[in-house]
Amino acid sequence: MPPTVFIVSDGTGITAETFAHSILSQFDQKFRLVRVPFVDSTEKAYATLEKINEAILQDGRRPIVFTTLVDSASNQIVKGSNALVLDMFQTFVEPLEQELELKSSHAMGRGHQNADTEEYKNRIEAINFSLAHDDGQSNRNLADADVILVGVSRSGKTPTSLYLAMQYGVKAANYPLIPEDFERGKLPTPLLAHRQKMFGLSIDPQRLSEIRNERRPGSKYAAPENCRYEINEAEAMMRREGIKWLSSTHKSIEEIATTILQEIKLERAAY
């Protein structure tokens, strides 16, 4: 049985979970994640303590607990378990308070709390823009895009666009490159005026064939030779047009998004 990991927070737990994933990914081990958000009272802290102790009995080993609890009383209750408790405040915030000689707000995940902030509104606007301009659905207002992702079908354009919008408030459109474009030897007409905003995604042809076969098994669309043709043509077109691009084959969405932001020199803070 994989080790149990609790993500305990008095809010959504997004910050704690992101941190936990970053740390746990360093180990070649599967983990069973148990999310415990909104622990905003001592009663809920005691209920969480009970869950942790139950896991100890069931697993025969102590679990790992990542916590971002602001309330010291609730935090002490959770720390009363026999688990390995990793307190993000104690580990990182308190030493920074001493170094900076300042008291922190002790409000983990502040950026997620106020739905009326300008940043929140910008993010929602970016998400709506990316959804409206997914897969070339609309050519309207392409001039408003921060970036336009191009590439063959199933090369990772849609998830990357949405990740950029949700995490960074980037207005990311995406547009497919199709066989008709390769036959003409030109970019799709609606994109011609926006070369400076374009960024390309490619992918290993064999991997592309596997992905497409999940969607349309046995089709020409998914055939290895067709995938090789489309990728070769797409990469040749991007080189001709001076479009920066990368292969998404062995990269996570986070890595792809970070590279795009660096390449197009767009400075945005993650929400």
UniProtKB/Swiss-Prot annotation:
A molecular-function term among this protein's GO annotations = ATP binding
Q: List the disulfide bonds.
A: none
Keyword Kinase set for record: yes
Which reaction equation describes what this protein catalyses?
[pyruvate, water dikinase] + ADP = [pyruvate, water dikinase]-phosphate + AMP + H(+); [pyruvate, water dikinase]-phosphate + phosphate + H(+) = [pyruvate, water dikinase] + diphosphate
The answer to whether UniProt assigns keyword NADP to this entry is no
Which InterPro entries does UniProt cross-reference here? Kinase-pyrophosphorylase, PSRP
Instruction: Could you list this entry's UniProt keywords, alphabetically sorted.
Output: Kinase, Nucleotide-binding, Serine/threonine-protein kinase, Transferase
Using the UniProt record, name the top-level EC class of this enzyme in a single word.
transferase
Q: Which positions in this protein are listed as binding ADP? A: 151-158
Q: Which domain of life is it from?
A: Bacteria
Supply the EC number(s). 2.7.11.33, 2.7.4.28
Q: Which Pfam families match?
A: Kinase-PPPase (PF03618)
Q: What PANTHER family does the record tag this protein with? A: PYRUVATE, PHOSPHATE DIKINASE REGULATORY PROTEIN 1, CHLOROPLASTIC
The entry assigns this protein to a family as follows: Belongs to the pyruvate, phosphate/water dikinase regulatory protein family. PSRP subfamily.
Q: What does this protein do?
A: Bifunctional serine/threonine kinase and phosphorylase involved in the regulation of the phosphoenolpyruvate synthase (PEPS) by catalyzing its phosphorylation/dephosphorylation.
Put simply, this protein is called: Putative phosphoenolpyruvate synthase regulatory protein
Q: Which organism is it from?
A: Paraburkholderia xenovorans (strain LB400)
Q: What is the lineage of its organism?
A: Bacteria, Pseudomonadati, Pseudomonadota, Betaproteobacteria, Burkholderiales
